[in-house]
Amino acid sequence: MLFTVSCSKMSSIVDRDDSSIFDGLVEEDDKDKAKRVSRNKSEKKRRDQFNVLIKELGSMLPGNARKMDKSTVLQKSIDFLRKHKEITAQSDASEIRQDWKPTFLSNEEFTQLMLEALDGFFLAIMTDGSIIYVSESVTSLLEHLPSDLVDQSIFNFIPEGEHSEVYKILSTHLLESDSLTPEYLKSKNQLEFCCHMLRGTIDPKEPSTYEYVKFIGNFKSLNSVSSSAHNGFEGTIQRTHRPSYEDRVCFVATVRLATPQFIKEMCTVEEPNEEFTSRHSLEWKFLFLDHRAPPIIGYLPFEVLGTSGYDYYHVDDLENLAKCHEHLMQYGKGKSCYYRFLTKGQQWIWLQTHYYITYHQWNSRPEFIVCTHTVVSYAEVRAERRRELGIEESLPETAADKSQDSGSDNRINTVSLKEALERFDHSPTPSASSRSSRKSSHTAVSDPSSTPTKIPTDTSTPPRQHLPAHEKMVQRRSSFSSQSINSQSVGSSLTQPVMSQATNLPIPQGMSQFQFSAQLGAMQHLKDQLEQRTRMIEANIHRQQEELRKIQEQLQMVHGQGLQMFLQQSNPGLNFGSVQLSSGNSSNIQQLAPINMQGQVVPTNQIQSGMNTGHIGTTQHMIQQQTLQSTSTQSQQNVLSGHSQQTSLPSQTQSTLTAPLYNTMVISQPAAGSMVQIPSSMPQNSTQSAAVTTFTQDRQIRFSQGQQLVTKLVTAPVACGAVMVPSTMLMGQVVTAYPTFATQQQQSQTLSVTQQQQQQSSQEQQLTSVQQPSQAQLTQPPQQFLQTSRLLHGNPSTQLILSAAFPLQQSTFPQSHHQQHQSQQQQQLSRHRTDSLPDPSKVQPQ
């Protein structure tokens, strides 16, 4: 029993142990699985990150056009880092020590600042004196542009008395050692000497001035200097000169002024066309300065506000600036000349200003001046000043395809060209434009220790009297281009001797045919320019002559023609031409001006008799004044000699005027006045004569000189209402409808013009009998009508037709006498008309 119980207990314990072991194994497997999963995740994450970095590194490497594996990317990265390390070490070796150079300045900026502080400039010359490099700071010290010195000899800018000494210093120093070892170049080649250098000027005619300078430098072998140590110097050497310089030595020196300058010119413009804006009062005081000004001039706005602009200008530029400002005040806008402005760093900077005056929007008073200042370089200023002086800037002599040994050939070319130009013009010319081509400078200078800093040129030996001939050619060309040649003969006479003499020039020895042909090409170019300018001037002359001829013709048309009034072909009517009247009354009748109707000459007496008989035909052409025939003149004198009121109509008088009759159409109405005046202007006529005609109510015709023609028209009242219409806006001919006194009310538009005193019945018969020969010119039928059509205000549909008939009825005149009793003023006019009317029974038809 006990055994059975113990066995059962043992079996239960074993079962419990097995289950616990199984559970433990399961737990261990779960833990291992979890660890493995986490490890795989971390490994995958690391691989992904590594791949991303490799990919990014490969994208930064150059030459990654093809896909690279990881090892290639790593290898190229290693190569790049190794090369970068070498370059960094090389740069550190040539880097200026940080203890005395600020970290925020580069080597070039620090070098420029050091040169400005030392009042010096860099100069690199060969042992024979050829200049191969000049820093830009030479302009602020000696007023030379770098292009003036490069490829020139240093002896051209040193007085002649110092040539031998400087040449000895440059040449004998290298004879001490035949081999240029690195140790020698580092330790024993230090060289210092003093001499005088020529100062540049804008005008070459100014006397030369020399500055006492000091050279401090050493010799450098051009092939021993590393590319990183060149610091931009290699780029300044021309490519054609580099092979000859590779095995040679140059002298690199810092040239300093013995006497420092207190104020220098800031001539280097790193960014051209820099500008800033300011506003000034009318007294030229600063009112505003924009944010672009401080980096250029150094002043902040509050430092200049209220100060005058003239406080910052150079004393030599004040006169020109004052003229520019006067021009501004006169015209309201303008552009200034080049002038120097003093910066805060005590340096002169060249500026040019565009300015204009702004006005108040309400009262239009000037408020202030707006200025836009532009920074310009000294090269532009010098070129502009020399152009004003008539001197052209010349380019440097050397070209890219010439070597150093071509200097002698250039001299031969310039000498031969000088001979050609001297044959062309024997008169001497002043010195030329640029000092860059100066080859010699003859000035006697005493010992430097006893001479002042600035040595003026001795007048007995001018330093620039021997000049290259090509400079004279440039100056002559500029003078020729500024001349005005008036004809082709002048241009040909100037240019033909040039070519004829140039072609006859012998070619000097050592001078190639190509070089001589280049000179002839230059002469031909000059000749072509002269001929082209001559043709342009001739064309201008011909055009001006043609314009002058047209103006003269127009003046002759205005002053030479008389008064001519034109009739429209569609509107026939009566038109009076140039009426010539004498001044005052005379007892003897001289001549009567004829009136042309449809090309027929009709004397005035025929018109008068025609008015009495009513035979006046319609006219279709303009009236032209012609010479009176002798037969009509005699008949008119015989007829009108007995008139109590006589009319004088001479054909020509001295100092007379012609009166154009601008039409004024008068249509009578009962309420209107009976007197109408028609003024007309009177232009001049060189061949015809005129006077002033006055028609009065008492039927007297008076003629007196004056500037205005006053025509008095007597209007007869009619039963129907009429309107007085001034037709000056129509600008047509004078239309006169002679009065018809019919019994019908339809003939209401009547215009009566009294031109002469009516004669007695016996005189009427005599007038009719005498005028029979002259009236043969009129071939009209007995019954004619005078009509005129006039467009009112340009409207073709609206026409004003004045029609008047002249029937031979005896009841006409009593009917008109009966109609003149409507008003007191018209009654007086009717009495005058009744006294002057002839007996209708004695009027005979023509």
From Swiss-Prot:
The modification Phosphothreonine is found at T451, T461. A motif (Nuclear localization signal) lies at residues 32-47. Component of the circadian clock oscillator which includes the CRY proteins, CLOCK or NPAS2, BMAL1 or BMAL2, CSNK1D and/or CSNK1E, TIMELESS and the PER proteins. Interacts with KMT2A; in a circadian manner. Forms a heterodimer with BMAL1. The CLOCK-BMAL1 heterodimer is required for E-box-dependent transactivation, for CLOCK nuclear translocation and degradation, and for phosphorylation of both CLOCK and BMAL1. Interacts with NR3C1 in a ligand-dependent fashion. Interacts with ESR1 and estrogen stimulates this interaction. Interacts with the complex p35/CDK5. Interacts with RELA/p65. Its EC number is 2.3.1.48. Residues 447-463 have a biased composition (Polar residues). This is Circadian locomoter output cycles protein kaput. SMART domains: HLH, PAC, PAS. Keywords: Activator, Acyltransferase, Biological rhythms, Cytoplasm, DNA damage, DNA-binding, Isopeptide bond, Nucleus, Phosphoprotein, Repeat, Transcription, Transcription regulation, Transferase, Ubl conjugation. The keyword Transcription regulation applies. Residues 450-570 are annotated as: Interaction with SIRT1. One of its GO terms (molecular function) is DNA-binding transcription factor activity, RNA polymerase II-specific. Changing S38E: Phosphomimetic mutant with no effect on DNA binding or CLOCK-BMAL1 transcriptional activity. Residues 514-564 are annotated as: Implicated in the circadian rhythmicity.
